[in-house]
């Protein structure tokens, strides 16, 4: 593995009989593929590179005997049995628990930026990490650890899920080296009592593997055993610091790009990791980011291994395959950079979600009422006029796909899913028949968005919208106007987002469970809220106080949004009832009396809470009950 990881040049040369086109491809290949593989020349990074993907689907350990019948059904040779007198390995002792998850983000930033990197550039990061680790290793040259080795060293075939690593209790000997990078290799020997996470692994096999490796193992694969002295505990922490850096903070393209302030970039990635951990970034998109990052790492390893198997005079097919692998890496790299730049924020819609054109009205000018129900009866349409054009669907998605501007979609009780709710471009009305709790529309977890509108006038009436897994707001108004009337919104991500220039009317509805604010108004948006309940929002698990202020309604200003609130009940939110996000205090003016005019007693619970508001802020509040919110009722928040 390590020899593969240190390949420095792609093996692609041109034979004398190659065509000009092939020569061009291969020459381009040398220049372009060399760049993404330079990162693998580092002994540090090769140690912590992602393990090679398992080849094949067979799953049977070489030296653990399965039932003979199983081997026969698989048409494979029976494997030799482990001798009955073979001594079973003892269970592994506990290792030091990683302190990284327990650190506050400010502590992580101080550790990496101030203590370890100390202003280093990206190309000097490896040396800085090596120097930091070597300093800790000087305190103790012998200690016990668990070597978590690659199962491929011991097994021909195995289940990666059931055997993520082969753990062996070893005694570690650290010898000072002249080269900083070489300190990432240490001498190991089997410690007594013989211990492993695989009870029946033969000791002679372990000795054989260690002999082949010259009793040397990557230091970052060794985890110090708990219960040793303070020096070993410091070594364990240092190892976790280095592992965390290369697993989560380092990118292979870092030393290939000019970054004026590398520590600032590391701080951004620490914030990104913390936002994923504390739920600021919803789980589905965080999972997608992690999978893309892992795929990127694996593709780089695949490229290096493919290059190492190419002969001195590669064929055109090999060159093209090498180029394809490189192209995949470039695409994944670009995607990761884009996601990192956008910070994956649940608060900020950075791009249009709808790229579909409006249909407009039908050619013959008529509108259709779409009935969504498994079976349609005459009773369902008795209240409709005799000239109403009807179309029945048993699928809400098909009904929405059939709509033109002016159509009405009538939904009868049941449970529905419809990805087309995220593509509302025409002026339609979607309404339920019966109690809103009986018309349940759930989002599809595989989609980013649930309900997104950019039509001039869309109405949703008497519906329950239940968000499951989508990462966007439960309802996003990109442009135009959207009305929610007598609806129940059970959020899992953010609540209702009204983007710049869009407008929203919510009446007699209930919004609950949002990770951020229940209603989020972007600069220049308009919202009218009447007779609603907004509660139990801002369920972010975060230590960042700036994010914990969001609650019922959040307004982002410059230019100021317009908000009219009447007869709303905003309660039991983890942030403020109403928060107004300002960029800086230089725009504040004193207008406490204006904002409190006409407010109910709940709005004035603390007269000192609101002392300044935006000069151009257009807020009208009448007879609202804002109470029992964790942070308070109304607050200006400086961004």
UniProtKB/Swiss-Prot annotation:
Residues 285-312 form a coiled coil. Its main location: cytoplasm. GO terms for cellular component: cytoplasm; meiotic spindle. The keyword GTP-binding does not apply. Pfam families: Beta_helix, SHCBP_N. Testis-specific spindle-associated factor that plays a role in spermatogenesis. In association with HSPA2, participates in the maintenance of spindle integrity during meiosis in male germ cells. This is Testicular spindle-associated protein SHCBP1L.
């Amino acid at each position: 593995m390590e020899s593969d990881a240190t390949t420095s040049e792609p093996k692609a040369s041109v034979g004398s009989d190659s065509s000009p086109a092939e020569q061009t491809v291969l020459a381009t290949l040398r220049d372009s593929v060399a760049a993404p593989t330079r990162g693998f020349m580092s002994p540090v990074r090769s140690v912590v590179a992602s393990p090679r993907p398992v080849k094949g689907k067979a799953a049977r350990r070489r030296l653990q005997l399965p039932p003979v019948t199983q081997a026969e059904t698989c048409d494979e040779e029976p494997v030799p049995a482990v001798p009955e007198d073979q001594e079973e390995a003892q269970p592994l002792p506990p290792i030091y628990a990683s302190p990284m998850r327990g650190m506050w983000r400010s502590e992580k930033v101080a550790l990496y930026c101030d203590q370890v990197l100390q202003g280093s550039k990206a190309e000097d990061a490896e040396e800085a990490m090596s120097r930091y680790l070597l300093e800790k290793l000087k305190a103790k040259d012998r200690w016990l650890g668990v070597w978590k080795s690659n199962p491929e060293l011991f097994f021909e075939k195995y289940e990666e899920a059931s055997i993520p690593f082969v753990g062996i209790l070893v005694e570690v000997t650290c010898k000072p080296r002249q080269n900083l990078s070489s300190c990432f290799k240490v001498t190991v020997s089997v410690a007594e009592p013989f211990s492993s996470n695989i009870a029946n692994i033969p000791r002679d096999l372990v000795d054989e593997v260690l002999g082949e490796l010259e009793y040397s193992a990557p230091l970052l694969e060794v985890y110090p055993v708990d219960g040793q002295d303070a020096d070993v505990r410091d070594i364990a922490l240092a190892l976790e610091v280095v592992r965390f850096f290369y697993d989560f903070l380092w990118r292979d393209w870092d030393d290939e790009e000019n970054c004026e302030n590398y520590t600032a970039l590391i701080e951004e990635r620490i914030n990104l990791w913390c936002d994923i951990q504390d739920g600021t970034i919803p789980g589905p998109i965080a999972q997608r980011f992690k999978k893309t990052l892992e795929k990127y790492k694996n593709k780089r390893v695949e490229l290096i291994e493919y290059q190492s198997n190419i002969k001195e005079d590669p064929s055109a097919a090999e060159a093209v395959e090498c180029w394809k692998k490189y192209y995949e890496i470039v695409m994944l790299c670009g995607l990761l950079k884009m996601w990192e730049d956008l910070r994956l924020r649940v608060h900020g819609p950075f791009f249009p979600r709808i790229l579909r054109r409006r249909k407009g009205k039908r050619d013959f000018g008529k509108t259709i009422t779409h009935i969504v129900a498994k079976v349609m009866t005459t009773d369902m349409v008795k209240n409709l006029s005799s000239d109403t054009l009807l179309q029945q669907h048993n699928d809400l998605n098909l009904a929405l796909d059939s709509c033109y501007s002016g159509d009405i979609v009538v939904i009868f009780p049941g449970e529905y899913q419809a990805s087309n709710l995220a593509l509302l471009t025409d002026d339609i009305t979607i309404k339920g028949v019966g109690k809103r709790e009986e018309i349940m529309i759930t989002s599809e977890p595989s989609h980013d968005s649930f309900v997104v509108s950019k039509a001039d006038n869309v109405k949703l009436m008497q519906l329950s919208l239940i968000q499951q897994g989508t990462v966007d707001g439960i309802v996003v108004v990109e442009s135009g106007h959207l009305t929610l009337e007598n609806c129940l919104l059970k959020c899992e991500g953010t609540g209702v987002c009204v983007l710049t220039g869009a407008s929203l009317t919510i009446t007699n509805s209930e919004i609950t469970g949002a990770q951020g604010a229940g209603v989020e108004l972007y600069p220049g948006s308009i919202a009218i809220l009447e007779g609603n309940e907004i509660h139990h929002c801002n369920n972010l698990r975060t230590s960042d106080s700036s994010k914990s202020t969001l609650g019922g309604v959040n307004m982002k200003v410059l230019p100021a949004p317009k908000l009219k609130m009447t007869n709303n009940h905003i309660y039991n939110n983890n942030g403020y009832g109403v928060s107004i996000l300002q960029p800086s205090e230089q725009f504040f003016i004193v207008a406490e009396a204006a904002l409190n005019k006409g407010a109910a007693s709940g709005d004035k619970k603390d007269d000192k809470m609101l002392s300044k508001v935006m000069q151009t802020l257009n807020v009208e509040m009448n007879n609202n009950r804002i109470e029992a919110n964790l942070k308070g009722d109304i607050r200006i928040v400086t961004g």
